[in-house]
């Protein structure tokens, strides 16, 4: 029988390693595999804002599997049924968006664990994650290898951050800069000094609680700031944004800049 593969991303968090990631929003296994050959420590497959179906997520997991980059899946929301599907297709690390309270965090923890630790539905014999029933003691191994990250991205979540950090089974907390800045009254302005102060404070509080702290920064200078503040899993770009920037830059070499978008982009 096959042994369940370890979760190198989770091991990296435990060792307090700095892990650099990339956001995948293109929804294709082809682009996912290209990214996986680039050497990023982790790749976030986005099911919240990118139009990914569960089958799309499945194909991207397959494309990334032969490489060292570790996949993280962000589902559209943290419902028990959807979490069950995403785990069954082989995800070992989840980023759950819009977690505002400790009770929500506890519900997500329960949805990701098999009984008696939680309420994850049992279907190992038809699940890629269990090699279709070929992994001995799969349920216990799955509970152990699961890495759960929750996303804090609202004023309410900030008020409840300490309580969320106390929830057992949460491995890390990810700060969502776009929604957070909008919730704080600074839409599309995560660089505002007040937002920056809050982000720095949150990273410190997360690390002080013994959890991993994550962030997405499409601006390299902001990514460096977050790393200096103590964030230890940071995504430094979005595939679709990098693609559009490269397209526009190449076109600008041959056509007047007036015909090419020069708008500053943010996630």
Swiss-Prot record:
Keywords assigned by UniProt, alphabetized: Lyase, Magnesium, Metal-binding
List of residues binding substrate: 151, 178-179
InterPro entries: Aldolase/citrate-lyase_domain, HpcH-HpaI_aldolase, KDR_aldolase, Pyrv/PenolPyrv_kinase-like_dom, Pyrv_kinase-like_dom_sf
GO molecular function, one term: 2-keto-3-deoxy-L-rhamnonate aldolase activity
Site (Transition state stabilizer): 74
One Gene Ontology cellular component annotation held by this UniProt entry: cytoplasm
Keyword Lyase: yes
Cofactor note: Binds 1 Mg(2+) ion per subunit.
Record-marked site positions (Increases basicity of active site His): 88
Keyword Metal-binding: yes
Annotated catalytic residues: 49
Binding site for Mg(2+): 153, 179
Catalytic activity: 2-dehydro-3-deoxy-L-rhamnonate = (S)-lactaldehyde + pyruvate
Reported cofactor(s): Mg(2+)
Gene3D superfamilies: Phosphoenolpyruvate-binding domains (3.20.20.60)
Pfam family of the protein (one): HpcH_HpaI
Catalytic activity, EC: 4.1.2.53
Family affiliation: Belongs to the HpcH/HpaI aldolase family. KDR aldolase subfamily.
Main function: Catalyzes the reversible retro-aldol cleavage of 2-keto-3-deoxy-L-rhamnonate (KDR) to pyruvate and lactaldehyde.
Quaternary state and interactors: Homohexamer.
PANTHER family reported for this sequence: 2-KETO-3-DEOXY-L-RHAMNONATE ALDOLASE
Entry protein name: 2-keto-3-deoxy-L-rhamnonate aldolase
Organism, scientific name: Salmonella typhi
